[in-house]
UniProtKB/Swiss-Prot annotation:
Pfam families: ADH_N, ADH_zinc_N_2. Widely expressed in mitochondria-enriched tissues. Found in heart, kidney, liver, brain and spinal cord. Residues 52-393 form the Enoyl reductase (ER) domain. Keywords: Membrane, Mitochondrion, Mitochondrion outer membrane, NADP, Neurogenesis, Nucleotide-binding, Oxidoreductase, Transit peptide, Ubiquinone biosynthesis. SMART domains: PKS_ER (SM00829). Transmembrane segments: none annotated. It is found in: Mitochondrion matrix; Mitochondrion outer membrane. It comes from Mus musculus (Mouse). This is NAD(P)H oxidoreductase RTN4IP1, mitochondrial. One of its GO terms (biological process) is regulation of dendrite development.
Length: 396
């Protein structure tokens, strides 16, 4: 009981921290949830019962309806969701050690208790039910959100999320368009703003390099940095060059023409580098930062989850700490900053992003949409890589 009380207080505190977001909405006298049946306790969803290849995806009509456990939670009827690379990786078991620890920090559950597991991180839909402490939303509100990977996902009829992870959907977007943005937008926002320290107040005139510019994170990063006045160089393949130029990239490097490192030598140095590629890129990318000027390299490709899968929680966290600390110190001595960034679920950040969207400064980039019946095909599309925007699933 003490643990439950502590969790409730913590979540309530998180919700209270966002009090400045909007005008508080008076609570309606009655809140009811609409489902496919007045007596229904189950819903349709795509789930996995074990980790593996695409064959583990299973459609069910009998997934339990989500319920509100904490007073700051809301239930959303999903109109559209999307598939991200993290979903494909999670389907295969990537990050299971760390995510299970987050789901069950006291190790009270037995192995495999996370199943059946629903994947999908993005949601655009309509609020159906609100917890008692939710003051910024009411049933009927159109909202969007990105669900943390340790929670049940959005490839289902309904999903429950914390109120501080939800934002009102941009008025200018349909649900299909809105579902393409939250996860990649918050990931890019984390890297550029929270870790990289850039914003509309200090970004003007800065030179930015985006490695892996044609995917979901890259296409958002181009647009937000251009909205803030930066000069953006994008690295992608030839067939994505037109796309990234239309999004605002000032210069485009085609990695199919040869060594990116060699091509970059003819350009001026950069103030900021966002790496969506990883691998060997960080062995040379930091050489293209301005030395001793606060220039920063931020990578979204880190060994954190892999270390915990391979070494266990304690050793994995120790190895991760040693790795990032060593690299950061090494590059600091060379006059540049080396950082890791991760997705951060945040309704207030989505509020800011929604303002940029409705102002016409950010537009969704959707490569393909799938009906709810073709979720496995959507996973295969994402798994093949070489994305030119997002893959969206229409649930309604």
């Amino acid at each position: 009981m003490g643990v439950l009380k502590t969790c409730v207080l913590r979540r309530s505190a998180c919700a209270a921290a966002c009090f400045w977001r909007r005008t508080v909405i008076p609570k309606p006298p009655f809140r009811g949830i609409s489902t496919t049946s007045a007596r229904s306790t189950v819903m349709p969803a795509w789930v996995i019962d074990k980790y593996g290849k695409n064959e583990v995806l299973r459609f069910t009509q009998n997934m339990m309806l989500p319920i509100i456990h904490y007073p700051n939670e809301v239930i959303i009827k999903v109109h559209a969701a999307s598939v991200n690379p993290i979903d494909v990786n999670m389907r295969s078991g990537y990050g299971a050690t760390a995510l299970n620890m987050k789901r069950d920090p006291l190790h009270m559950k037995t192995k495999g208790e996370e199943f059946p597991l629903t994947l999908g991180r993005d949601v655009s839909g309509v609020v159906m039910e609100c917890g008692l402490d939710v003051k910024y939303f009411q049933p009927g509100d159109e909202v969007w959100a990105a669900v943390p990977p340790w929670k049940q996902g959005t490839l289902s009829e309904f999903v429950v999320v914390s109120g501080n992870e939800v934002s009102h959907k941009p008025k200018s977007l349909t649900h299909t368009q809105a579902a393409s943005l939250p996860y990649v937008a918050l990931t890019a926002w984390s890297a550029i703003n929270k870790v990289g320290g850039l914003s509309d107040k200090n970004c003007k005139g800065k030179r930015a390099l985006i490695l892996g510019a044609s995917g979901g994170v890259g296409t958002f990063a181009i647009q937000v940095m251009k909205a803030w006045g930066a000069h953006v160089t994008a690295v992608c393949s030839k067939d994505a060059s037109e796309l990234v130029r239309k999004l605002g990239a000032d210069e485009v490097i085609d990695y199919t023409l040869g060594s990116v490192e060699e091509q970059l030598k003819s350009l001026k140095l950069f103030d900021f580098i966002l790496d969506n590629v990883g691998g060997s890129t960080e062995t040379w990318a930091l050489n293209f930062l301005k030395k001793w000027s606060g220039a920063t390299y931020v990578t979204l490709v880190t060994p954190f989850l892999l270390n915990m899968d391979r070494l266990g929680v304690a050793d994995g966290m120790l190895q991760t700490g040693v790795t990032v600390g060593t690299k950061a110190l090494k590059h600091l001595w060379q006059g540049v900053h080396y950082r890791w960034a991760f997705f951060m679920a945040s309704g207030p950040y989505l509020d800011e992003i929604a303002e940029l969207v409705d102002a016409g400064k950010i537009r969704p980039v959707i490569e393909r949409t799938f009906p709810f019946s073709e979720v496995p095909e959507a996973f295969l599309k994402v798994e093949r890589g070489h994305a030119r925007g997002k893959t969206v699933v229409n649930v309604v």
